Amino acid sequence: MNHNIIITSAGQRVALVRDFKETLVRFYAEAKVFTTDMNPELAPAAYVSDGCFEVLRVTDENYISQLLDICKKNEIGMIVPTIDTELLVLAENKKLFNDNDIIVCVSDLDFIKVCRDKRNTGDFLEKHNIRVPKAVDKYNPTFPLFAKPYDGSLSTNLHYIKNAEELTQDILDDPKLLFMEYIDKETYKEYTIDMYYGTDNCVKCIVPRERIKIRAGEINKGRTVKCPLMDYIKERLDKIEGCIGCICIQVFFN
């Protein structure tokens, strides 16, 4: 088995690459950690990896064949994705990589579809007794309300709407927007909960972090806390069919 690892969309994830390198050599002294990026020269993490490869955009029809070729030529045994837009295409091609003895650290396709479409995500959470913001009729709204795209990422196209004047026709006409009650941050604290699931689909680790500062939808400054959230989540999401590796869930909790 090949022990080299490749981390995709390296970007600014310097600490992540360094952690993988430091850990990997404890088990396989000669193993290397490679990276990919659309623009390696401008990716800080590329410079701390053992080599960075320029790749196409993940939505390009040739992306998978290019990535597979890189993996074969560099004896890659594991692919570690880092952004949510990669997950669907990698999950769809998981078997292709497995057939070439390459493990893709991504959950099964059905679970990825649940996560990538917030309409499905809401149904999933409710089935596991986790409350979600109530849906709002955009033509008969109660203010304030919140709107976000069902397939959104990086905190883009979000709308905090305080009154009828702010509910513009452009917002009403956007077919991707979901409308819901606004959750007041003065009443609830916001957390990102990092979780790790094994190949048996059972949770192995739960780490809640209070979200203090956000950058492009990701927590930039946070505080790790031990709180009732750990037991709350363990009781409800102890096992998720098709879930493997790292996932995170964002919650409001008081």
Region spans (language model):
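ATP-binding N-terminal substructure of ATP-dependent carboxylate-amine bond-forming enzymes
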Residues: 1-105
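Flexible, glycine-rich phosphate/dinucleotide-binding loops
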Residues: 14, 42, 153, 167, ...
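Short gly/pro/ser/thr-enriched loop/turn and capping motifs at secondary-structure boundaries
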Residues: 41-43, 87, 110-114, 214
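Short, charged, surface-exposed secondary-structure boundary motifs
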Residues: 63-66, 107, 113-117, 216
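Active-site nucleotide/adenylate-binding loops and adjacent lid/helix of ATP-dependent enzymes
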Residues: 109-187, 197-202, 227
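Phosphate-binding site of ATP-dependent enzymes
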Residues: 162-243, 252-253
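Catalytic phosphate/metal-binding cores of nucleic-acid and nucleotide-processing enzymes, i.e., regions
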Residues: 249
